């Protein structure tokens, strides 16, 4: 399963974001999926 908007993700080990989202690690407490612009 892939992670969608505002769900936790890990760019190095998974879970990976769904198509159309990228893993952003700028927010606390960890990485979250954000929509691609």
Curated annotation (Swiss-Prot):
Subcellular compartments: Secreted
Keyword field: Amidation, Disulfide bond, Ion channel impairing toxin, Knottin, Neurotoxin, Secreted, Toxin, Voltage-gated sodium channel impairing toxin
Annotated positions for site Pharmacophore: 8, 12, 22, 24, 26, 34
Domain of life: Eukaryota
Keyword Secreted in record: yes
Secreted among keywords: yes
Pfam families: Toxin_7
Tissues expressing this chain: Expressed by the venom gland.
InterPro entries (alphabetical): Beta/delta-agatoxin_fam
PROSITE patterns named among the record's database cross-references: MU_AGATOXIN
Record GO terms (molecular function): sodium channel inhibitor activity; toxin activity
Modified residues (Serine amide): 37
Disulfide bond annotation, renumbered to this chain: 2-18, 9-23, 17-33, 25-31
Gene Ontology annotations for the cellular component aspect, listed alphabetically: extracellular region
A Gene Ontology BP annotation from the UniProt entry: envenomation resulting in negative regulation of voltage-gated sodium channel activity in another organism
Coiled-coil regions listed: none
SUPFAM superfamilies per record: omega toxin-like
Protein task: Binds at site 4 of sodium channels (Nav) and inhibits the fast inactivation of cockroach channels. This toxin is active only on insects Has a potent activity against S.litura larvae.
Protein family membership: Belongs to the neurotoxin 07 (Beta/delta-agtx) family. 01 (aga-2) subfamily.
Record remark: domains: The presence of a 'disulfide through disulfide knot' structurally defines this protein as a knottin.
Record protein name field: Delta-amaurobitoxin-Pl1d
Highest classification ranks of the organism: Eukaryota, Metazoa, Ecdysozoa, Arthropoda, Chelicerata
